[in-house]
Design a protein with these regions (language model features):
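Short beta->alpha connector loops at strand-helix junctions that form conserved
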Residues: 85-86, 128, 154-155, 177, ...
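Boundary-proximal intrinsically disordered activation/regulatory segments immediately upstream
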Residues: 1-71, 157-158
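Short acidic-hydrophobic, aromatic-tinged amphipathic segments that line or gate anion-handling sites
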Residues: 4-10, 81-86, 176-186, 243
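A glycine-rich helix N-cap at a beta->alpha junction
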Residues: 75-95
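Short, aromatic/basic amphipathic alpha-helical patches
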Residues: 67-79, 235
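RNA substrate-binding interface of SAM-dependent RNA methyltransferases
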Residues: 5, 107-205
């Protein structure tokens, strides 16, 4: 049986990890062994458990303890604390209405190397400085649905384990293998692994998405840039190809998550 602890005051320190710790504080780079992330909703929590993530505590509405949370709690150590409170207290937590009544603090798993993530992968996505957690989450969902085998990210971008990113991804950040790229010339590391690199950018010499050189590549990395400015000139210069999405009505760009969906469908799913 879960160790249920009822909270009566929003200022209770037991709620600090859920209500007052920032995402950066949870990451705890000074002490990685104690770094945490928060998973929201039964679906996301379940997928995190499927991926082997270790729960530390739960926060949920009282009815979920014996309701839709019972199956999840049954998969966990019965001595884990399960905090609960009235809806009046819980709704003081910013965004609680988006959590479907259930949150879980979990330990951050150690990240694999780029080579480990890419082992056996034919199509991967690379995110250079994508800053918005919503975009990162949406891209992971597209990657899972549209044939991407892995996602690599630069360290300056948003963390896939941020609450909003994992929620928007519908838990797909726990299904698609991912890790961070090394500092410096990471395109060289991808070339060493046998990947053809395709930079999504509007240039005069850009290839169309359906170019045979892209479709026939044995291993292809689709490289997407930050919101607004897109990829850096240095990254574009270091990639094998520059690729564009043909558009009409004078539109010259898409949101990065929308561009990812189009590119993944053509270069991922269609090439399987």
């Amino acid at each position: 049986m879960a160790q249920v602890i009822e909270i009566h005051d929003f200022s209770d320190p037991a709620l600090d990890v859920y209500a007052r710790a920032t995402e950066n504080q949870l990451v705890n780079r000074a002490d990685p062994a104690n770094a945490l992330f928060i998973a929201e909703s039964p679906l996301v929590i379940g997928r995190a458990l499927d991926a082997g993530c270790v729960p530390v505590s739960f926060l949920m509405e009282p009815q979920h303890i014996t309701g839709k949370g019972a199956e999840i709690l049954g998969r966990c150590d019965p001595d884990l604390p399960v905090y609960t409170a009235s809806l009046e207290v819980l709704t003081q937590l910013t965004g609680f209405h988006l959590t479907r009544g259930m949150l879980c603090a979990m330990r951050r798993p150690p990240l694999p190397s780029v080579a480990e993530v890419c082992a056996g992968a034919r199509r991967i996505a690379v995110l250079e400085n994508v800053m918005n957690p919503t975009n990162v989450g949406a891209i992971f969902r597209c990657a899972a649905a549209l044939g991407m085998d892995a996602v690599l990210l630069t360290t300056e971008g948003s963390d896939p384990l941020y609450r909003r990113a994992s929620r928007v991804s519908m838990g797909n950040v726990f299904l698609v293998p991912w890790t961070y790229l090394p500092e410096g010339d990471w395109t060289a590391a991808l070339h060493d692994l046998g990947f053809t690199t395709a930079a999504m950018a509007l240039r005069e010499d850009s290839l169309r998405l359906d170019d045979p050189r892209l479709l026939s590549a044995e291993r292809l990395a689709v490289v997407l840039g930050t919101e607004g400015d897109g990829l850096t000139d240095g990254t574009i210069a270091q990639c094998d190809h520059t690729v564009m999405i043909p558009m009409t009505h004078g539109v010259d760009s898409l949101y990065v998550a929308a561009a990812a969906a189009v590119a993944f469908y053509q270069l991922g799913l269609q090439c399987q």
